[in-house]
Amino acid sequence: MNNKLFLRNKQHINLGTIGHVDHGKTTLTTAISYLLNLQGLSKKYNYSDIDSAPEEKIRGITINTTHIEYETLTKHCAHIDCPGHSDYIKNMIIGATQMDIAILVISIIDGIMPQTYEHLLLIKQIGIKNIIIFLNKEDLCDDVELIDFIKLEVNELLIKYNFDLNYIHILTGSALNVINIIQKNKDYELIKSNIWIQKLNNLIQIIDNIIIPTRKINDYFLMSIEDVFSITGRGTVVTGKIEQGCINLNDEIEILKFEKSSPNLTTVIGLEMFKKQLTQAQSGDNVGILLRNIQKKDIKRGMILATPNKLKVYKSFIAETYILTKEEGGRHKPFNIGYKPQFFIRTVDVTGEIKNIYLNENVQKVAIPGDKITLHIELKHYIVLTLNMKFSIREGGKTIGAGIITEIKN
């Protein structure tokens, strides 16, 4: 872990780019860093810095979520660039669970595509209210009516999924044009009046002006583990976004695993955010936590770090659930009691079995796409569950439902 200290002089937020494959998410992330770099607020990240895995470079798509850091005038930003390809939607869900603001990128040339629907539904289910819709590749379209039609179509989709339009911003622009302009002229004063630069500055200004809800700093500490790795000679580091509370160096915390046994107690011996050391991390921070006497093989993504004696693990619960229709990208056919899809809860995905189906308190044999029903679900293994927690249901590479936990069974 690094020796440089993290300076907390601006509000820290987590935001990210989502959307269909090849609509320009990574290009937009690159363009934002280029423009802020000219203004002295960010390191410049090239496309290759963000799509860093060998397979990503070969295929030209983002597979894993990538985190980069930059500052605006009022905020310190952790930017998560999420994959758009349907094969890697699991990684997108993990990235989206960390966001305060989602930037949904839509190509004006292609319009709304299958992953656009799915990503919107997922961020709604995760609970992200603040959304910036960036209609990209405007330079390739001279049909004003087409742009207006796509705006209308997006608006109708947001209303359909019950988004609060007071928290939605719809912008147009060209991320690639911004990059090309800056590569040719690195004097910000000479290019700041360019229409494409102005359009991207509008997006950055919206990020600056969005008010992030008060963090749950005074609650007990809770973090869902996103990743784990070892540092030779130091120990095991777990990463993730702190959901609530604070954590300090030398604090004792517990690891809640996927089994009903006594949690592992450990001590925090290092805290880091974007390669800078912290003495304290708080709700909303994306951190790496160095743990004492813990081996990498004993930690899995989706396990929970928490203040001791605050949480328990369960595997059975009741949930109010909506089953997506075929038109929404869901199942084409009903499912029965005994159906075993995947459940995505925080950063974990786990198989679960439908034990019972209820409609208006009456037991049903089947659930039909489009139904709003109550399900009794039993997971394959134990995880930390809390009331009112939201989750997604997936099968065969697509989202088929979404729900909220209303009762936890011992």
Curated annotation (Swiss-Prot):
Record's catalysed reaction(s): GTP + H2O = GDP + phosphate + H(+)
Record key words, sorted: Apicoplast, Elongation factor, GTP-binding, Hydrolase, Magnesium, Metal-binding, Nucleotide-binding, Plastid, Protein biosynthesis
Gene this chain is encoded by: tufA
Ranges where the tr-type G domain occurs: 10-214
Enzyme class: hydrolase
Binding residues annotated for Mg(2+), in chain numbering: 26
One example of a Gene Ontology biological process annotation: mitochondrial translational elongation
Residue positions binding GTP: 19-26, 81-85, 136-139
Alphabetical list of HAMAP family matching this protein: EF_Tu_B (MF_00118_B)
Organism: Plasmodium falciparum (isolate 3D7)
Protein name in UniProt: Elongation factor Tu, apicoplast
Residue span of region G1: 19-26
Subcellular localization: Plastid, Apicoplast
GO molecular function: GTP binding; GTPase activity; translation elongation factor activity
Keyword presence, Acetylation: no
Region of interest (G2), ranges: 60-64
Domain of life assignment: Eukaryota
